[in-house]
Every structure is written in C-alpha cells, then in structure tokens.
C-alpha cells in the first residue's frame, strides 16, 4: 500500500509541475525553428566544403607516386 501511495504522489507532483510549464508563443517558436534550420544549413555547407577539400587532398597524395 505504501508503494502505491508513493507512485500516486509522484504522478500528482508530475501533474503539478506540468501546470507550471510555459510554452513558447508562435512567434518565439517560429524564430527558434528558423534559427535551427539556418544553423543546420550552415553546418551542412561547412561539412560539404571540408569533405570536398579532404577528398581532393587525399586524391593529390595518392596520385603523387604515379
């Protein structure tokens, strides 16, 4: 019985904390989403450039001996 009470108490506290959650406004959510999309795009471009550069360097090094 004591164990069941602890579980009940836990879920009551979860419910109380859920009421304290402050959700972002539509404007904040849109701005945050845009920041994430731009950041992913920029980091993807950086990875693309680095990958292309490393690929070319390796190709040059492999072709030196030929």
Curated annotation (Swiss-Prot):
InterPro entries: SecE_bac, SecE_sf, Translocase_SecE/Sec61-g. GO terms for cellular component: plasma membrane. The gene is secE. The chain crosses the membrane at residues 34-54. Belongs to the SecE/SEC61-gamma family. Pfam families: SecE (PF00584). NCBIfam families: secE_bact. GO terms for molecular function: protein transmembrane transporter activity. It is a single-pass membrane protein. It comes from Rickettsia bellii (strain RML369-C). Keywords: Cell inner membrane, Cell membrane, Membrane, Protein transport, Translocation, Transmembrane, Transmembrane helix, Transport. It is found in: Cell inner membrane. The lineage of its organism: Bacteria, Pseudomonadati, Pseudomonadota, Alphaproteobacteria, Rickettsiales. GO terms for biological process: intracellular protein transmembrane transport; protein secretion; protein targeting; protein transport by the Sec complex. Component of the Sec protein translocase complex. Heterotrimer consisting of SecY, SecE and SecG subunits. The heterotrimers can form oligomers, although 1 heterotrimer is thought to be able to translocate proteins. Interacts with the ribosome. Interacts with SecDF, and other proteins may be involved. Interacts with SecA. The keyword Iron-sulfur does not apply. It comes from the Bacteria. The keyword NAD does not apply. Essential subunit of the Sec protein translocation channel SecYEG. Clamps together the 2 halves of SecY. May contact the channel plug during translocation. This is Protein translocase subunit SecE.
């Amino acid at each position: 019985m004591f164990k069941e009470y602890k579980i009940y108490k836990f879920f009551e506290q979860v419910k109380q904390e859920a009421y304290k959650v402050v959700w972002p406004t539509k404007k904040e959510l849109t701005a945050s989403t845009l920041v994430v999309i731009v950041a992913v795009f920029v980091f993807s471009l950086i990875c693309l450039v680095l990958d292309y550069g490393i690929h070319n360097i390796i190709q040059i090094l492999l072709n030196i001996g030929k």
